[in-house]
Amino acid sequence: MTMDEQQSQAVAPVYVGGFLARYDQSPDEAELLLPRDVVEHWLHAQGQGQPSLSVALPLNINHDDTAVVGHVAAMQSVRDGLFCLGCVTSPRFLEIVRRASEKSELVSRGPVSPLQPDKVVEFLSGSYAGLSLSSRRCDDVEAATSLSGSETTPFKHVALCSVGRRRGTLAVYGRDPEWVTQRFPDLTAADRDGLRAQWQRCGSTAVDASGDPFRSDSYGLLGNSVDALYIRERLPKLRYDKQLVGVTERESYVKASVSPEAACDIKAASAERSGDSRSQAATPAAGARVPSSSPSPPVEPPSPVQPPALPASPSVLPAESPPSLSPSEPAEAASMSHPLSAAVPAATAPPGATVAGASPAVSSLAWPHDGVYLPKDAFFSLLGASRSAVPVMYPGAVAAPPSASPAPLPLPSYPASYGAPVVGYDQLAARHFADYVDPHYPGWGRRYEPAPSLHPSYPVPPPPSPAYYRRRDSPGGMDEPPSGWERYDGGHRGQSQKQHRHGGSGGHNKRRKETAAASSSSSDEDLSFPGEAEHGRARKRLKSHVNSDGGSGGHAGSNQQQQQRYDELRDAIHELKRDLFAARQSSTLLSAALPSAASSSPTTTTVCTPTGELTSGGGETPTALLSGGAKVAERAQAGVVNASCRLATASGSEAATAGPSTAGSSSCPASVVLAAAAAQAAAASQSPPKDMVDLNRRIFVAALNKLE
């Protein structure tokens, strides 16, 4: 077909036929229902007494009034539904369809073999595969006849769409209206005759061909195509409509049964087209002579044994044959870029040439084209069959088996400046993931295996270090004794030390938590008195860090250091007690000079001595003690407390000078005890606490007396 014939065929009218409604299929929506009585009544009313249309309805794209592409040539109510036959006559629309069909891969595949290729018809069959009727919404005859005026027009137009909302509305395109009606087996001969009479009579009422009714453009058609992509289950509906109408029993251009995956697989078709173009370029024209490089006539080669030909089938594509070569050209020119192709010229020779000494079966073996995919076993079988021809063609030649080449030898190891060998990354990877032993440096061992013996040039490694200690807390706490450290055995170095520190052994961690909870209890808080700087704050008592395990073998030195620290505290406390005892003695001496007696003060204690052991010089003792007690009284009234033992020493010396009878007697006679009680009561009544510090001091003295 020439170019002019193709263009004239492209602008020729295209007929489309199909059902607008099926009476045996109930629609999903009530507004789409078209009963048979209503349809026949509308046809009689609009056809002026005839069951057909008197005025041609417009035919558009997706109910777009600006995209009118033709008219409805016939419409008739048949046994199964309302049938329609339309005619596409818009030149602009047909030209757009022709240009778009040239870019479509689905259209390039062509129709079924008995049909003639027609790109315009195939494009319309794939893009607008459904028919849709625009009519009034009526459910019965009474509602249809109740309207008046312009609303009495039952049908408005018929649209070409991607898929119809009513079931069974599949569109069939063709160049001949008679051929289109024959695609539907549900139409009887009488139905076809009535449709034929309508389209022949509708020629005078068709749209004027001089004025193109299509006022849209390619952008509007592209927008409609995008909308069609979002139709849910479009292909299953088209397949159902195709089976319902019965188009599957006859050949047509309908693409409803073609899946998108099969439509996009055009590799075989492109290989077929490329093979045809190569064969046409290699085959000389009729009457042309092939030039020869040698003056001698060419020798006709013997015909090789050819494999049996495959039966012709539209689904089987012929394999691409290599380009034919002239007899003067060498056979190596047709070899493929394969490692074994240079050694197997018989397998790569063209089908029309043979090699001397080769068997017919081997000489007929040809490499397939790139579009054929072979399994691995079949590929190596072909290589094995071609390898048998190598000794025949080249005596003494040995074909290499298709096995993996041996691994290259590793690079030698060179000693570095510090004496250790330089090892590459490949050697390290081989040691970890393969059975590789470096002959130059056997000191490296594989992971998860015991290391081999060291090189004799290396010195003997030192023995393992003994058990060491590791601190539990940060290194900042240097004042903590070694008893708070954790001991790690040298034999367990293979395990992680952090595992021991952070809960590796559950018993040790539990004991640490219990010790911390016991130390944080409120019962261990020390006492504080009002007026002190730390009153109201919880103060912890000093505790000795005793080994929780009960053992004392490794903590003897630490306990000794702790005992020394606590001995110093005990000495300080004892010194304070001696000072307080001296203060009480001075207050006792001061009370002897006071004549009045009162009740004993709660802050003083009486010293019990035998009453029968009284000295003869008892009258001189208060007088002798009064001179030393005057200074103490003055200091007591001034709020000064002497925290030393001088008063007790002075009183003892004065008592010694008073007479020999008092030096050998008891430390406190009965008169002195009574006088001390009276003096303390008078001092307590006469000198009240001056400030809070004095009050706290007296309370602290009373507390120490209770402890004693």
From Swiss-Prot:
Alphabetized, the UniProt keywords read: Host cytoplasm, Host nucleus, Hydrolase, Phosphoprotein, Protease, Serine protease, Viral capsid assembly, Viral release from host cell
One Pfam family here? Peptidase_S21
**Is Cytoplasm among this UniProt entry's keywords?**
no
Q: Return the motif ranges for Nuclear localization signal 2.
A: 537-543
Task: Indicate the impact reported for residue 157 to E.
Answer: 12-fold loss of protease catalytic activity
Please tell me, according to the UniProt entry, what happens when changing residue 227 to N.
1300-fold reduced catalytic efficiency
Low complexity biased stretches = 284-293, 326-339, 593-611
Q: Looking at the record, which segments are called Disordered? A: 269-339, 455-565, 593-619
One annotated GO molecular function is: serine-type endopeptidase activity
For this protein, the record's InterPro entries field holds:
Herpes_virus_sf (IPR035443), Peptidase_S21 (IPR001847)
Ranges annotated as biased composition (Pro residues): 294-311
Q: Where is this region: Interaction with major capsid protein?
A: 688-708
Question: Catalytic center at which residues?
Answer: 63 (charge relay system), 132 (charge relay system), 157 (charge relay system)
Q: Give the recorded effect for residue 229 to R.
A: 1800-fold reduced catalytic efficiency
Entry's Gene Ontology BP terms:
nuclear capsid assembly; proteolysis; viral release from host cell
Cleavage (site feature) positions: 143-144, 209-210, 256-257, 643-644
> Coordinates of motif Nuclear localization signal 1 in the sequence?
510-515
Gene3D superfamilies, sorted: Herpesvirus/Caudovirus protease domain
EC number annotated for this UniProt entry: 3.4.21.97
What is stated about domains? Region of interaction between pPR and pAP is called Amino conserved domain (ACD). The region of interaction with major capsid protein is called carboxyl conserved domain (CCD).
Q: Which family is this sequence assigned to?
A: Belongs to the herpesviridae capsid scaffolding protein family.
* Name of the featured protein: Capsid scaffolding protein
Q: Which organism is it from?
A: Human cytomegalovirus (strain AD169)
Gene name as annotated = UL80
